[in-house]
């Protein structure tokens, strides 16, 4: 994944990121166990967030750097965007993430599911409290 749109975290636009957990979990469907994703970006926020996204989506971060060109690996192929950002003095961040074959390694839960679970727990607690108060009035 090279220099994808960082989709700032304003509103819900970050959900469109190619490294957002929903996307990374989808990639697990066709990526072989132990398969790798190489990710490069110039965007600091996207990279920092992705450092959390990958493990929550069932990937082990095997290698990472906040300055790819400081000790550039032999495998790196510089893209046009990479060259442009480097000339501007922007450091290129990169990582290699490996798919963990264990489905239990996916710990991410969709935010709307978390909200629903919290709402249901609050409703159950309120119902239990009301039932308890009703028993005390008898």
Which residues are covered by each model-predicted region?
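A structural signal for short, well-ordered beta-strand segments and their strand-loop junctions
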Residues: 38-40, 62-63
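A short glycine-rich, Lys/Arg-flanked "PGG" loop and its adjoining helix->strand segment in the class I
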Residues: 17-36
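Conserved class I S-adenosyl-L-methionine
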Residues: 8-13, 41-57
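SAM/dcSAM-binding transferase cores
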Residues: 61-138
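A short SAM/SAH-binding and catalytic strip from SAM-dependent methyltransferases
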Residues: 1-18
């Amino acid at each position: 994944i090279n220099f994808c749109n960082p989709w700032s975290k304003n509103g819900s636009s970050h959900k469109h990121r190619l490294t957002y957990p929903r996307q990374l979990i989808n990639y697990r469907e066709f990526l072989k166990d132990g398969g790798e994703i190489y990710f490069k970006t110039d965007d600091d926020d996207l990279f920092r967030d992705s450092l959390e996204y990958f493990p929550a989506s069932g990937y082990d971060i095997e290698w990472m750097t906040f300055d790819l060109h400081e000790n550039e690996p032999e495998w790196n192929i510089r893209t046009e965007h990479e060259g442009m950002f480097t000339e501007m003095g922007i450091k290129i961040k990169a990582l290699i993430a490996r798919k963990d074959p264990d489905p239990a390694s996916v710990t991410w839960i969709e935010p709307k599911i978390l909200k629903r679970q919290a709402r249901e727990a609050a409703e159950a607690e309120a119902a239990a409290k009301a039932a308890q108060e009703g028993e005390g009035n008898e």
